Amino acid sequence: MKKILFLFILTISCNVLGEDISDFKIEGMYIGESLLDYYSEEEIFKNKSNASYNLKEAKFYSTTFRNSNFENYEAVEIFLKSNDNNYIIYSIRGGIFYENKIEECKVKKKEILNEMKNFLKMNFVSGELKHQFDETGKSIQYQSYFLFEDNSNIRVECYQWS
């Protein structure tokens, strides 16, 4: 079967807004600040995903923006807490799409991991796993992550969708 899409994703997320993780930004946006600093409520709801996430009993949803003016990513997905009128960012991920070019995705992943490792002065954990949303079991995630003391993390991933 032909491989359809390769996706590079850098995810920054935290369980509790900690000092370590909040220094990182994707396309100028930080965890812990309001998404209203960048987008209107109308734009947030227009781009809202139908999926919701239940992380430690707080319901979250995501909203995704595609902007040709982004410097590093083709799309940014932001996770917000349901019923939060301040629209505080709890997790943010940037994506680059590599159609039928998994090796290019892996090169970009390695480049970012090396930069992050030098900056963070810590090691990362890597592995491959089947993507949970592909019922065929043929799609693979190439995942690496840095785990902080407060259980927040930075993940760098390539998805190979089948």
What are these regions (language model features)?
Residues E19-S22, F45-E111, E115, F124-S162:
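Amphipathic N-proximal alpha-helical interface segments
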Residues L35-D37, I44:
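Long, hydrophobic N-terminal alpha-helical segment
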Residues Y38, M116:
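Hydrophobic pocket/interface hotspot
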Residues K3-V16:
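Sec-dependent N-terminal signal peptides
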Residues D20-L35:
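Short N-terminal segments immediately surrounding and downstream of signal-peptide cleavage
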